[in-house]
């Protein structure tokens, strides 16, 4: 094989490190604020306020509902007024990660890539209702032709492409001048974890030297909330929002939908070293599988989750004895938490009892496509600072969930390496493994 700058030695094992990250979440609009709140066990769940949730079975969420802050982010990045909230917070988190890594000069290159997990944004009931109202004919009748015509007029004015899933990746590539590969991944709750995994692989195989990877999601809207309610996976603890998300607790009754964004700058370790940029942690392994079971349910035997964790360990050339912390998918649904616990015990065997396991979703809800990125960033911070954030609202133990879930209070601990689990509708499973930097 003839070596070129686009095809390095195929036998080489390039190390991949994190040099910057940033987050926008309901408990902190940048990484430091989020981390301080997470370690303190702050909940971002409250009654939905940016639309009237009356009549919905679930009326609570961990939403990004500070309109003034969203507009501040929009102005900072000179984004169009028609760009959806998910794009705005995604660009904000990406800009923060790039600034933290000092990576802007090296992103404007064909040796850089952008990898995004998001589902885009759709028209909600208010949009459709307004379109129907505006398209009325004499006597108040709404025809298909009239509705379609009004929809087309409004979509054109709004620039409909801005709601497409691939728009955020394209927007980021344009914003930073990235001319290498771009990818948008839609695998439900594993989207941004898989995006980061593919960025890691692209660096490992030499396709790029640096990548901007993560995800964003802002879908707390009437239709989305109702759809998740119809699946029977949402908590209905409307009277006590702050304690509704309670992963691994015996009283758990479903997840709380959240909103947010998380981005990380990944780069080849030698590339970061040449730039003189210190690494925060190393991304050392990645595993991905599919249950091939049911679109709406995970396999009860946890085979996909088990396979993803084992693949990540094998990819990193580590064993169960080398892992100290697990950032669990931990949705607070009866089935997920039980299956994930059993899967961890299967993979780690006797080592499982000493693991620290916690769920970020207990504080910020389930941010769907953005969850994997936010939770990997949390895992990186845990490795950096040698502390495991808590699973809040854990009060009543479940006999089938019997690991150390870091209940309610952060735990300082030696964390040499950690994994972040993401499992999604459709049977998608992704596991990312990070470890501390060898000094």
Report residues per predicted region.
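Conserved small-residue
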Residues: 18-20, 38, 94, 114, ...
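ACP-dependent fatty acid/polyketide chain-elongation machinery
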Residues: 1-80, 101, 118, 270-282, ...
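Active-site-proximal alpha-helical scaffold in enzymes
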Residues: 90-103, 165-176, 182-217, 256-277, ...
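Glycine-/small-residue-rich "gating" segment that lines the acyl/pantetheine channel
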Residues: 137-155, 197, 201, 218-273, ...
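Flexible, low-complexity linker/loop segments at domain and module junctions
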Residues: 1-18, 106-109, 316-322, 353, ...
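Conserved beta-ketoacyl condensing-enzyme motif
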Residues: 18, 42-186, 216-225, 320-336
């Amino acid at each position: 094989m003839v070596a070129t700058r686009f095809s390095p030695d195929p036998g080489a094992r390039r190390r991949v490190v994190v040099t910057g990250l940033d987050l926008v979440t309901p408990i902190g609009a940048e990484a430091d604020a989020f981390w301080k709140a997470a370690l303190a066990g702050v909940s971002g769940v409250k009654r939905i306020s940016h639309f009237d949730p009356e009549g919905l079975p679930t009326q609570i969420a961990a939403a990004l509902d500070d309109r003034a802050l969203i507009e501040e982010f929009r102005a900072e990045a000179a984004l169009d007024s028609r760009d959806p909230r998910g794009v705005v917070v995604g660009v904000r988190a990406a800009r923060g990660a790039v600034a933290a890594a000092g990576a802007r000069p090296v992103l404007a290159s064909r040796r850089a890539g952008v990898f995004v997990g998001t589902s885009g944004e759709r028209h909600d009931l208010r949009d459709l209702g307004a379109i129907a109202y505006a398209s009325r004919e004499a006597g108040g009748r709404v025809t298909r032709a009239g509705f379609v015509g009004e929809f087309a007029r409004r979509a054109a004015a709004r620039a409909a492409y801005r709601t497409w899933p691939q728009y955020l990746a394209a927007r980021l590539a344009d914003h930073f001048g990235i001319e290498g590969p771009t990818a948008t991944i839609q695998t439900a709750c594993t989207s941004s974890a898989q995006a980061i995994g593919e960025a890691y692989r692209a660096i490992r195989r030499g396709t790029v030297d640096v990548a901007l990877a993560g995800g964003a999601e802002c879908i707390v809207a009437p239709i989305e909330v109702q759809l998740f309610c119809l699946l029977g996976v949402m908590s209905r603890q409307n009277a006590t929002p702050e304690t509704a998300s309670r992963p691994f607790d015996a009283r758990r009754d479903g997840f709380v939908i959240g909103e947010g964004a998380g981005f990380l700058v990944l780069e080849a370790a030698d590339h970061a070293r040449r730039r003189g940029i210190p690494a925060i942690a190393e991304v050392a392994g990645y595993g991905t599988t599919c249950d091939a079971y049911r679109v709406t349910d995970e396999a009860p035997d946890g085979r996909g989750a088990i396979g993803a964790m084992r693949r990540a360990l094998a990819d990193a050339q580590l064993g169960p004895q080398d892992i100290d912390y697990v950032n669990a998918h931990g949705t607070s649904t009866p089935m997920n938490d039980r299956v994930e616990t059993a899967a961890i015990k299967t993979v780690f065997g006797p080592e499982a009892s000493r693991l620290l396991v916690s769920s970020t979703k207990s504080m910020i809800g389930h941010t769907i496509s953005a969850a994997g990125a936010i939770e990997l960033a949390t895992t990186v911070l845990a490795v950096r600072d040698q502390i495991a954030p808590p699973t809040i609202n854990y009060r009543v133990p479940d006999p089938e969930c019997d690991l150390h879930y870091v209940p309610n209070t952060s735990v300082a601990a030696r964390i040499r390496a950690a994994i972040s689990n993401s499992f999604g509708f459709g049977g998608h499973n992704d596991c990312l493994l990070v470890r501390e930097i060898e000094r």
